A protein has these predicted regions:
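Acidic, proline/glycine-rich low-complexity IDRs
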Residues: 100-139
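Short, flexible coil/linker segments at or flanking structured domains
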Residues: 3, 90, 116-118
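Amphipathic alpha-helical interaction segments
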Residues: 64-65, 91, 106
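Long, contiguous N-terminal structural blocks used for assembly/anchoring
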Residues: 1-86
Length: 139
């Protein structure tokens, strides 16, 4: 668990599907919208929004896989998920447009908060990427 400068625990933020995918993982908001885009299901305006805002996000913060190619490698980190730090308000605020697209297509997505989202495998100023903690045997 990481602590904020105020002394309290950091509450990380993630936007994800409400139901797990075929691998048992909860796809994040960007993955959900990108999947709709790749399937050709977005309107012209939605596709324009997706492309424009994906490009903005690409410039706004580091792609963890460019820093460490194994971060999202399913053979190495099959449960890797990204969480925003609460201080990344400029990134979190722009998620609303993605949520509107998902709602228009009947795709449920929720915001999840956690002070301990998992084992941190990558961290920068605005995000952490974590994997699920393995249960510890008792006894």
């Amino acid at each position: 668990m990481t602590t904020q400068g105020s002394g309290g625990p950091t509450e990380y933020v993630r936007f994800q599907a409400v139901t797990p995918n075929e691998r048992g993982h909860f796809t994040g908001v960007f993955g959900l919208v990108n999947r709709l885009g790749r399937a050709g299901r977005l309107s012209d305006d939605q596709e324009h929004f997706r492309r424009e805002n994906n490009a903005w996000y690409d410039l706004a913060y580091p792609d963890p896989s460019n820093v460490d190619p194994t971060v999202y490698d399913p053979a190495v980190n099959p449960t890797a998920t990204a969480w925003f730090k609460p201080t990344a308000t400029h990134l979190i605020e722009r998620v609303d447009g993605y949520l509107e697209i998902l709602a228009a297509h009947g795709v449920e997505c929720r915001m999840v908060r956690s002070t301990d989202p998992g084992h941190v495998i990558y961290e920068d100023d605005v995000q952490v990427v974590v994997t699920r903690r393995e249960p510890r045997p008792v006894g």
